[in-house]
């Protein structure tokens, strides 16, 4: 059975049960999951593409002049100086309450430790005829980090993007983030930047910030890789500049899928779903469960926890439009449905989460058991919280140190190795009709050096 939580029902009292929509087959459940995956496609995106195209064209042609105009129009303040001074960044850190400083430092320590384990190793191989082959990793020169503003401040985004770049050995880490109408970036965001090795910070947001990083302007350095989440305009801008620069991913609205059995606690499931829904009206929270009572009681518990919620409207819109409950006969079916959806975040609130996790192939991150809520991973678990969304966990993974690195192949053939392999190369080149490829082998074969 599939239960979709409707907006009007969320606003009713918790004593009234929400209507349950029954799915006649697994196919019906998969259909509902596909609708969630595709929730950002359509007319809105088409209109946004036109806006982004205009912004990219203007920034490329007019540089800082265009940035000034867009900042005034979209962010509400007028400036020709986008860079945040080092004094302001230090001041933000010094004025951060000690307890929050300690929390930021703890998160930094844990994230840095985990990501230091990801640094790829160079490899060297000596072939049978003395040829030396290798693969060498090196960091990009400059990385651009986008930190969103808007509905909330995200110092965790600073940590999760800047620390992997720092660990990778990136020479210059450039951060952009939209300021408020007074031209100020959130103080905790600046405090997080202070401790993560960021070299420069610019008060700049939206598609215009992405274009500035990709192309460079009079004041904004051109970078090699751009990472960080944003709204639909930021995401489309990243899509447009990809190929000119590297990017981490095309992030869609956030999502969580929870698989729960008889051992799951109702209040845990509800709170974890709301923790996802409070991000954004387009965020999605899904429960797939074998527990009939949990499925029946969850709407009322969500309603109860929404009482006096500071982000009530966002949660209601998210849950009502993109919340989903699926009741299954067994955990194997739950896992199969989860793999079909390929969630960004997957929580396993089951009796044996490690065993169930072994049957999961498609998930950005898996949170196992009652003591590993998604919020742990969002802030300081260690693994990165920048994860594939909208079904892309089928082929993509989390942001990591390698996002800010590239590899170079090394080939050093000896004369003996050349002679041993030359005939095969000529045959292969001829089969492709590439005369000069074959000739580059023959000419060496005929010369003595």
From Swiss-Prot:
Q: Which family does it belong to?
A: Belongs to the histidinol dehydrogenase family.
EC number annotated for this UniProt entry: 1.1.1.23
Judging by the UniProt lineage, the source's domain of life is Bacteria
Q: State the Gene Ontology terms under molecular function.
A: histidinol dehydrogenase activity; NAD binding; zinc ion binding
Q: Which PROSITE patterns match?
A: HISOL_DEHYDROGENASE
Say if the entry is tagged with keyword Flavoprotein.
Answer: no
Q: Where is substrate annotated to bind?
A: 254, 276, 279, 345, 378, 432, 437
List GO terms (cellular component aspect).
Answer: cytosol
Q: Where does Zn(2+) bind?
A: 276, 279, 378, 437
Q: Name one Pfam family in it.
A: Histidinol_dh
Which residues of the sequence carry a binding annotation for NAD(+)?
A: 146, 208, 231
Q: What is this protein called?
A: Histidinol dehydrogenase
Alphabetized UniProt keyword annotations: Amino-acid biosynthesis, Histidine biosynthesis, Metal-binding, NAD, Oxidoreductase, Zinc
Function (record text): Catalyzes the sequential NAD-dependent oxidations of L-histidinol to L-histidinaldehyde and then to L-histidine.
Top-tier EC class: oxidoreductase
Required cofactor names:
Zn(2+)
């Amino acid at each position: 059975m599939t239960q979709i939580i409707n907006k009007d029902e969320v606003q009713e009292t918790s004593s009234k049960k929400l209507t349950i929509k029954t799915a006649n087959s697994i196919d019906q459940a998969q259909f509902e999951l596909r609708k969630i995956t595709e929730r950002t496609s359509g007319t809105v995106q088409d209109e946004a593409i036109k806006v982004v195209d205009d912004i990219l064209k203007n920034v490329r042609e007019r540089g800082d002049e265009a940035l000034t105009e867009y900042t005034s129009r979209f962010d509400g303040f007028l400036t020709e100086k986008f860079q945040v001074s080092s004094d302001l960044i230090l001041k933000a850190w010094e004025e951060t309450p000690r307890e929050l400083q300690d929390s930021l430092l703890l998160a930094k320590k844990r994230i840095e430790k985990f990501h230091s384990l990801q640094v790829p190793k160079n490899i060297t191989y000596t072939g049978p005829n003395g040829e030396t082959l290798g693969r060498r990793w090196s960091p990009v020169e400059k990385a651009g980090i986008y930190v969103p503003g808007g509905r909330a401040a995200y110092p965790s985004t600073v940590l999760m993007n800047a620390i992997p770049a720092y660990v990778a050995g990136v020479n210059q880490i450039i951060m952009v983030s939209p300021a408020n109408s007074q031209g100020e970036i959130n103080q905790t965001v600046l405090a997080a930047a202070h401790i993560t090795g960021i070299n420069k910070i610019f008060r700049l947001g939206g598609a215009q910030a992405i274009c500035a990083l990709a192309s460079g302007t009079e004041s904004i350095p051109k970078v090699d890789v751009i990472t960080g989440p944003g709204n639909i305009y930021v995401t489309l801008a990243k899509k447009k500049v990809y190929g000119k620069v590297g990017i981490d991913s095309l992030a869609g609205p956030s999502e969580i899928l929870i698989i729960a059995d008889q051992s799951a606690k109702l209040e845990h499931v509800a709170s974890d779903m709301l923790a996802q829904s409070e991000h954004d009206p387009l965020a999605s929270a899904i429960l797939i469960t074998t527990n009939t009572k949990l499925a029946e009681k969850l709407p009322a518990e969500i309603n109860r926890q929404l009482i006096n919620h500071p982000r009530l409207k966002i949660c209601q819109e998210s849950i009502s439009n993109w919340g989903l409950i699926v009741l299954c006969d067994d955990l194997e079916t739950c896992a199969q449905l989860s793999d079909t959806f390929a969630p960004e975040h997957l929580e396993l609130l089951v009796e044996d989460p490690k065993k169930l996790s072994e049957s999961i192939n498609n998930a950005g991150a898996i949170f196992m058991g009652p003591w590993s809520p998604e919020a742990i991973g969002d802030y300081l678990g260690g693994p990165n919280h920048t994860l594939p969304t909208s079904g892309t966990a089928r082929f993509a993974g989390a942001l990591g140190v390698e996002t800010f690195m590239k590899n170079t192949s090394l080939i050093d053939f000896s004369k003996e190795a050349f002679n041993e392999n030359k005939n095969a190369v000529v045959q292969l080149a001829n089969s492709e009709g590439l005369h000069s490829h074959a000739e580059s082998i023959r000419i060496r074969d005929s010369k003595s050096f």
